[in-house]
Structure formats: C-alpha cells, structure tokens
Amino acid sequence: MQTIKIYENKGVYKVVIGEPFPPIEFPLEQKISSNKSLSELGLTIVQQGNKVIVEKSLDLKEHIIGLGEKAFELDRKRKRYVMYNVDAGAYKKYQDPLYVSIPLFISVKDGVATGYFFNSASKVIFDVGLEEYDKVIVTIPEDSVEFYVIEGPRIEDVLEKYTELTGKPFLPPMWAFGYMISRYSYYPQDKVVELVDIMQKEGFRVAGVFLDIHYMDSYKLFTWHPYRFPEPKKLIDELHKRNVKLITIVDHGIRVDQNYSPFLSGMGKFCEIESGELFVGKMWPGTTVYPDFFREDTREWWAGLISEWLSQGVDGIWLDMNEPTDFSRAIEIRDVLSSLPVQFRDDRLVTTFPDNVVHYLRGKRVKHEKVRNAYPLYEAMATFKGFRTSHRNEIFILSRAGYAGIQRYAFIWTGDNTPSWDDLKLQLQLVLGLSISGVPFVGCDIGGFQGRNFAEIDNSMDLLVKYYALALFFPFYRSHKATDGIDTEPVFLPDYYKEKVKEIVELRYKFLPYIYSLALEASEKGHPVIRPLFYEFQDDDDMYRIEDEYMVGKYLLYAPIVSKEESRLVTLPRGKWYNYWNGEIINGKSVVKSTHELPIYLREGSIIPLEGDELIVYGETSFKRYDNAEITSSSNEIKFSREIYVSKLTITSEKPVSKIIVDDSKEIQVEKTMQNTYVAKINQKIRGKINLE
C-alpha cells in the first residue's frame, strides 16, 4: 500500500499517492499538510497492482461537467470517458477519445461546485455513473499519482483556482479573434493574394490567412515550395499591406534527410525507442523523426527554429497532427488489408506512436504511454518560447491537441469535423466542454472540414450559413475545408447566401470589443469567453439540459439556430432580458419564440462595448473593457475610471430617458429608436461620468 499525503492551500487540496512523476509539475504555493482525510474529501482510493482507482459518490441530482473535448452531452453522467489523444478525423457524436485530454471534472451538487483534477497524461478512464450508478470511478494506470480537489462554491471559483494551478491563459492579439480563412490548401502565392483581394473587394474583413502543408517543399518543416511560393517575403508583405496576417501550419515530423538542416541540427533531440535507437516513423514528409519535446534542450532547439521562421514576417503558427500522430502502423495495416479480397475503410487506422517509444522528462526516461497526452502541451510551450525568443509582443498559436495547461500557450480548435446537421450541434457541445475545462480560446472549422470522400457530408448552403452563425461568438472564427470539399469562402457562394454570411461576419466585428474584453478577463481570471447557461445559473437544474444556447460572458445570451428551421424557441434563465433586435424586455424563466436568424438577448445588469467606440448599458453593473477602462452604471449615472472616447451610447431602460449630461457640462438629447431603447450620439471623450435624465 502506497503512502497517501494530503496538502492544502486556499481551497485546493493536493492528494499525493506514493512517489508520482507527473507529466508537468504544478507546484501548490505555500502548501501545508492538511488535516482533512480522504473520507472528508468524499473519496475512496483503491490500489490494484500498477493502477490507482479513485472513487467518489454520485448523487441522483448531482451534475458532472468538464473533461474537455468530449462528443457527448455537457452533463457527463452515465457515460465512460477515455483520456487519450488521437487523430480522430471525421469523428461523430459519442466517439471517444478525440484530440484533447483535460482530466478535470467539476461536480455541482446542491448548487455547490467542486473540481477534481488528475495530473496524469496516461490513459486515464473516467466512469461517471455507468458501471456503478452511484459512483464516479477514475482509473489511473500508474502505481503513484497526484490529483487535486478544488473547492468552489461557484464553477468560476473552481476554474479560477484550476488556472491558478495550471496557468492562466495567454492574451492573444485582438486580430486573432477576427475572421480567418483557410483551406487544405491555398496555393500558389499569387492565388492567396488574389483571394484576399476578392474577399476585401466584396466587403469581407479578413484578419488572417492560413497556409496548410502544401506551402512546404516536399512537406519539410520550415521550408517554402520553390514553385508554389517562390517569393514568400513578397507574399507576406502583400498581405500585411492589406492588413492581413499569415499563419502557417507546422507539424511535428522532421524529414530524415542528411541535406536538411533541422534534421542535422536536431540530432540527439528526437524521440527514441527503448533500445536507444531513433524512433523513425512516417508522416507527410515520408521517413520522419519526431522532436522529444519533453527534453528542455529540444524545446530550446525548437524555439530557435520557430524564431527563425517568424523572422520572415510570419504572424502565427498552426500546430497540427500533434496528438502525436505517426502513420507507420497505419501504413503497415493498410498494406495487409490491401492484400485481402475484402475492402476495409481505413480512415480510422492506428496512428499513434508505438509502445516502445520513450521520452526524457526532467532527466528521467519515461515510456510514451505514460506521458502521451502532454506531448502537444510541451510542443506548444516550445513554440510559445519561439515567439518570445523573436521578441514578438503578439503571439498566435493554434493547436489541434492539448493537455491541462494548454491554455497558457494556444488556441484549440475541434479538428477534422464533417459537415452535417448533427455535427453543427456537436460543435457547440465540444467548444463549450473545452471552455468549462479551463481552455477559453476555442473554435471549430466553420463549414465542416471533410470533403466529398465522406458520404455523410451535407454541402447545402443553408448548413454552411448556419455554421457561420453558430460560431458567431466563438473565440476562434475560421472557415476551413479539405481539398475535395466545396468552397466555404463566402465570395464563392450565390449572392443570397454571400450576403447572409457578410451580415454575420460584420456582426461579429461589431461585437469584437466585447469578445476581446472577455479575452482579457480570461487571461486574468481563467473565466471562459463562451459558456453554457448553467455556468451562470448553476443552481437551476433546468439549465443543464440546454445545449443549443450559450452565454458570451455574463451578459449576452445567444441561441443559434442549429436545425433546418428559420425560427426557434429560446429558453431564457431567470432575470430580465433585452431582445437586441426589437428592444423587447422579457421576464426570464420563460420560453420565447425568436423569428430572427441570430437570436441575441442581453441580460439586465450588462455593459457591452461595441466597435466604433459604442456602448450599450442595461441596468446597474460594472465592467472592465479590453483597454482596462472600468465602467460602472447605476440607475441614473454611468462612471468611467479614466478618460475614454464614446461615439454612441445606447441605454436600455423601461423608464424613459430624455437626455444625458456629460461630465456635468454638456447636455445631449436622446432619441428613442425602438421600445426600451434610447440612443445618444456623443462623439467625444468622457473624463468622468454621464448622468441620465
């Protein structure tokens, strides 16, 4: 029986069984031995050989949320979940596992939230009331382990403490939340600039362009294809002239080639097998070796490569295939299957590293299976350091895979989804699951990635438009499509659908100051940008059943239409809600019908900064804008912590407002534009306050 020790600090309890060697060290500051016992924490521990099993009771009305990227309902009860990063192309609902492993779940019992985080990057299994109806059973395939119990009482309290432990999210630049376009793949380089010109001519604001693997020379990392991209500096300059950023894909496989500089400089820094030989696999470049990102010297080397690449003017890095994926065994299996008289689908063949791969972590040799899920975390860490080495103030990294702590370095997107009405709904569940697991900067491939090779796809224009609408407030907003898919860039759509997408994209830009203010809050406190309704109303059991609406911060409720219908019923939680489109104020705990294509409701007690220095104020509250200006509203006054420029002020009120007085001096008349909506055109700097009369 291994020894069990419990430490505590500020509502976080660290349970240490034996002498664990965690994939990443999360030191508990000022930890002290706790007087609490396991039973007082509500836990039972069973040690079976090389496994540790942790059990907690599960009440009938208890809710279990979190666990990251899972293709299931957000209330995780009555299912079993595996933490094991895989290349899950063309995944569907209830497929598990997927690309990201976040071994954190949050229990909400009698309105009180408690978090449970297991710091293991091996294949941890969470059984949430499936095998035994009244238990959560966590099986860790290690004889020593550490985990944390995190007290709330609110869900946001748990996430604040969890991200204090694992790291607060980085703050990306504002452009990273703009509209991005991507394709597998855009080339040659003249076509890239031509596409941007077409988009801008048609009135679409493009924040960034992504280049997939075809920009490389023979798929070798940190190279440009000599014919497709003969003048990369010219390409970058042309995009920057148009205020468009360039983001390039960077996989993890280094081609075995004695004339290839990264292969030569990386010798001694690649993954090995148990015999001490190099692990040689197969990836896009062909015969491939893989950086052992667990080694500090490897991360330094990789940071140097990234820094050199960025020095050309590249603005962002897109990390793909980093579960990590290797094609060796898939190729071997495919060769066997091809010799058989029966045909098999091979799109989900084994693409993981073999069992005999080893890594070197903090000077210790460890098996791949023990740390697999943390591989993308260390890759993102090294890539982030590359930005720092290049003295970049603006950092943009997008990663497909991740582990606890990935929020410190990267955005996450949900991988290779398949366009369908079922997937449309699933994407919301996936991004919300990540959001409430400490990963605030998330998104999906708008339009669905997979192309015509998949019979299940739906290429209807209505579905494509609703993908754009679904993701309206997702932190990461990018269209992306496979080589054999339809064009998802709106300029190639019929005029009717093109204009619909334009309205959606422009609305996103209108709300971008609010979204970016929430990004600042995420970086400071660990709060999600978008969140399920139950995050704000955790003591209301009805909210745990709502999976087709989401909150954007505390103040905005969005109910995308995720069916073929043109209207929908919207569940409004308790409180008062303002219909953004017609000014109606509605009492909550109600269900209303929305006929607008983009149902948006503002919660009483909200301040929403909009593009063009506009503000919407509804009720009494306070809010910190992305520029750190504190805005506080009461029944008859709006105060500002410092001087800011306001072009237009929209006041939502059931009581009439006739005029405002700026800084006790300038009187401005107010126009009623629709019910409960009063607009003042200010167009000046405000030093201190606005009075409402």
Swiss-Prot record:
Subcellular location: Cytoplasm
Entry-linked InterPro entries: Gal_mutarotase_sf_dom, GH31_Enzymes, Glyco_hydro_31_AS, Glyco_hydro_31_C, Glyco_hydro_31_N_dom, Glyco_hydro_31_TIM, Glyco_hydro_b, Glycoside_hydrolase_SF
Pfam families: Gal_mutarotas_2 (PF13802), Glyco_hydro_31_2nd (PF01055), Glyco_hydro_31_3rd (PF21365)
Alphabetized GO MF terms: alpha-1,4-glucosidase activity; carbohydrate binding; hydrolase activity, hydrolyzing O-glycosyl compounds
Active-site residues from the entry: D320, E323, D416 (proton donor)
Listed GO CC annotations: cytoplasm
Gene Ontology BP terms: carbohydrate metabolic process
E.C. code: 3.2.1.20
Entry keywords, A to Z: Cytoplasm, Glycosidase, Hydrolase
Principal EC category: hydrolase
Gene3D superfamilies: Glycosidases, glycosyl hydrolase (family 31), Golgi alpha-mannosidase II
S-adenosyl-L-methionine among keywords: no
Cytoplasm listed as a keyword: yes
Cystine pairings recorded for this chain: none
Major subcellular site: cytoplasm
Catalytic activity, reaction form: Hydrolysis of terminal, non-reducing (1->4)-linked alpha-D-glucose residues with release of alpha-D-glucose
Protein family: Belongs to the glycosyl hydrolase 31 family.
NCBIfam families listed in its UniProt record: alpha_gluc_MalA
Function: Major soluble alpha-glucosidase.
Record's protein name: Alpha-glucosidase
Organism annotation: Saccharolobus solfataricus (strain ATCC 35092 / DSM 1617 / JCM 11322 / P2)
